[in-house]
């Protein structure tokens, strides 16, 4: 199905200095390893709701002490849906300039139409992205069948100068990328992985089982099921909570990779509630509030997102406190 690509027998230079060819074979495995922990970084705004690049740079400097594999830029937690095209690209450029070359930059390039996604993908690569994270188009989700999604992602991957990572986030899109579509797309030589934020470990394990012979890589989309993801063969995680508890999320990764499952389980327990609080319960306003408590620049969200109420702030702080991450 994917015998011809846009870049046959050609080596592509990536922003990080890595190189890959899209002629992936069954035995070769992934040409770009994406295993590890990534915070999907928040976008700081000024009081006038303009992107605050100074505070963004400060956050990146503060994250430099953590053993992250890289950064997801302009993902859901970056409020990409509220940024202009130029803002999305400029944030990627600034992040690429601010972090070491060995840190992988995975940029969210998803748009609603295939053509717009292709254009954004090419521009993200030109702005310094090493790979792109492409969310499912969902405005017309009733028509987003497996066939439509396979067609969409195939065209994007055919035209992308960097590797493509699929992104399924049903809580935001109302659409779960079907397993059969993922399995089909895993055969495309320029589609190297999936970020699955749905939290269905049975589904994640099935995808890994059906695609591992291709070197396809699956990332858990939340710290809440990071241990479970590693237990079925995920290679890492894109975790909102890593914006707040970066060292602890990386420690959970280390424990899992070293087979220290009992210690990993105890740490995982203490991350579940805070993770839920900064994702499903309080969302990006909660994430940004928690970042402030831990010395990072969270700040305001862009409208129409509202800040937490005083009661919500108290509830959020209580959750971090009872799990041992903050004092009263």
Curated annotation (Swiss-Prot):
> Which keywords accompany this UniProt record?
Lyase, Mitochondrion, Schiff base, Transit peptide
Q: Where is this site: Involved in proton transfer during cleavage?
A: 167
The reaction(s) catalysed by this protein are: (4S)-4-hydroxy-2-oxoglutarate = glyoxylate + pyruvate; (4R)-4-hydroxy-2-oxoglutarate = glyoxylate + pyruvate
A family per Pfam: DHDPS
UniProt superkingdom: Eukaryota
Record flagged with keyword Iron: no
Question: Annotated Gene Ontology MF terms?
Answer: (4S)-4-hydroxy-2-oxoglutarate aldolase activity; (R,S)-4-hydroxy-2-oxoglutarate aldolase activity
The EC number(s) given in the record are 4.1.3.16
Q: Where does substrate bind?
A: 76-77, 197, 221
Q: In the UniProt record, which is one GO cellular component term?
A: mitochondrion
Q: Which InterPro entries match?
A: Aldolase_TIM (IPR013785), DapA-like (IPR002220), Schiff_base-form_aldolases_AS (IPR020625)
Entry's PROSITE patterns?
DHDPS_2 (PS00666)
Q: What is its main location?
A: mitochondrion
The subcellular location is: Mitochondrion
**Activity regulation, per record:** Inhibited by divalent cations.
Targeting presequence: 1-26
Which family is this protein grouped under?
Belongs to the DapA family.
Subunit details: Homotetramer.
PANTHER family in alphabetical order: 4-HYDROXY-2-OXOGLUTARATE ALDOLASE, MITOCHONDRIAL (PTHR12128:SF66), DIHYDRODIPICOLINATE SYNTHASE (PTHR12128)
What does the UniProt function comment say about this protein? Catalyzes the final step in the metabolic pathway of hydroxyproline.
Protein name as annotated: 4-hydroxy-2-oxoglutarate aldolase, mitochondrial
Which organism encodes this protein?
A: Xenopus tropicalis
Please name the taxonomic classification of the source. Answer: Eukaryota, Metazoa, Chordata, Craniata, Vertebrata
